[in-house]
Amino acid sequence: MPTNYEYDEASETWPSFILTGLLMVVGPMTLLQIYQIFFGANAEDGNSGKSKEFNEEVFKNLNEEYTSDEIKQFRRKFDKNSNKKSKIWSRRNIIIIVGWILVAILLQRINSNDAIKDAATKLFDPYEILGISTSASDRDIKSAYRKLSVKFHPDKLAKGLTPDEKSVMEETYVQITKAYESLTDELVRQNYLKYGHPDGPQSTSHGIALPRFLVDGSASPLLVVCYVALLGLILPYFVSRWWARTQSYTKKGIHNVTASNFVSNLVNYKPSEIVTTDLILHWLSFAHEFKQFFPDLQPTDFEKLLQDHINRRDSGKLNNAKFRIVAKCHSLLHGLLDIACGFRNLDIALGAINTFKCIVQAVPLTPNCQILQLPNVDKEHFITKTGDIHTLGKLFTLEDAKIGEVLGIKDQAKLNETLRVASHIPNLKIIKADFLVPGENQVTPSSTPYISLKVLVRSAKQPLIPTSLIPEENLTEPQDFESQRDPFAMMSKQPLVPYSFAPFFPTKRRGSWCCLVSSQKDGKILQTPIIIEKLSYKNLNDDKDFFDKRIKMDLTKHEKFDINDWEIGTIKIPLGQPAPETVGDFFFRVIVKSTDYFTTDLDITMNMKVRDSPAVEQVEVYSEEDDEYSTDDDETESDDESDASDYTDIDTDTEAEDDESPE
């Protein structure tokens, strides 16, 4: 081992090393960014054609109109997707741009480095030296060698060459000779194949891929400081930060202290206690995340801010704090929902979902919440004039003018916008509900079934479509191999749920549906909640405006009504446990609730009929050996029968004689 190391004075190594490390970072980031630019929007929206465009535009424009300037300012600050400028000058884009600039500089430096070119020319390639291909025959090799020897042999060089030119020609001839021997002489060829050179092992040098001034010069202490900072400070800092975050937060993204508070509340929860929105908000006010955001505020302050938001009250100087904690409630309530399902507590789970609806729409949980979530509604006027109207379905039994009177909306333009929002809030109608087992016609003991729901997403303005009008083929599950292998794949092909109308929520909200399954026997939740984020809202488009429940019509004769134009959505819920081991009927409660709207949710009872598998008929397989044995058996049986026939005849005759004797 040499005691002295050579430094990379000619910059032969370190540019390539840095270039490789840089490309390992910049390359994948660039590909990911290109994918998001060209395919990210389509993957996020998920819809196509009118089934997407109308719903997105309706709520986009109305959200923009009814969102306050304070919330818009908050969104520009915290919502990265709300600012186009932030998309262009995002941190990732800046890193990519700077990275490719550095790549270009390094490539230019490498290409203009003569030392790298000289190192490349030192590589011995006999085929290149002789000017032949790697598939050349021995005859071609000898022919090329003769031609080059005539040109570069020292005895045949021109007399007018300078000493330098003559030296180059002689060196070239030596290389030609070595190349020829590397391909024809067996010993020299072995050296070339083993060491890469016909002369055998070449001298090697050990160096440091850094310039001398960084190690031996005045910059040496700086390099040591950089190494110490990288290995002793920066790397441990990021690793410890990652580890602390991993240990401090649950899989649902909530702090362990918050999760511990939720668990403690559920442990101490009394079944006789009524679950209300106020109770859930009280639990939320102790979230550790809120304390991290605003250390100077207390849980009572957080609870007051949440109450201000739900009742649409101004919080003065604490408005920004209110927006911040309200925006965080999304992950907190999903974490509470998951913990409640772990405790199998259906009341708390439903309370968490209803509370989130209240927070999204900024409406308290009352019998009138379906109406109060609409824009432009005069709350005091409506409560005094409401009568028995509490739902959107009941509201759309009135004429538009009467609806304006009930809601206290006098301006026709505002009334039209209110009706537009009301008619595009999704309602679910169950068409078909089954327990299915892939590849089976029925649920068998200990099998793995799942719940398949066929639903019609409709508007409260539209009349109910009789199930008898829906063709059976529109409800039938596909039976191909891929569907049997992964029955949930078809759900991923449905479009994403559009953005919700939520002008009071601090961030843009894309709606979803939460599915809960509980036992009808004891009311306990059986598994974790299933969140549905893909479901077609095509039936809410403008082309269905003619379909108004206030207009009497015969659907079978209406010229614009075509059942095939109506989208049937599919919701599949995997069960977290196998079917019971015994045969019988088992009843389950299935709940599908919107997380963003007060609307018509699904709450149905399903019967799981567990039956034994039908008996399989055994098919006898023909065998020549069995046939031989059966022939012998037949002969034996015939012999036995012939022997037994004598006794039979005697018995018969005797009986005949006995019968005749009395006569």
From Swiss-Prot:
Taxonomic superkingdom: Eukaryota
Residue stretches making up the J domain: 123-198
Lumenal side: 1-13, 109-220
Pfam families according to UniProt: DnaJ (PF00226)
Region span, 2 X 11 AA repeats: 461-503
Positions on the Cytoplasmic side per record topology: 42-92, 240-663
Annotated keywords: Chaperone, Endoplasmic reticulum, Membrane, Nucleus, Phosphoprotein, Protein transport, Repeat, Transmembrane, Transmembrane helix, Transport
Segments annotated as Sequence repeats: 461-471, 493-503
Matching PANTHER family: SEC63 DOMAIN-CONTAINING, TRANSLOCATION PROTEIN SEC63 HOMOLOG
Protein's name according to its UniProt entry: Protein translocation protein SEC63
GN (gene name): SEC63
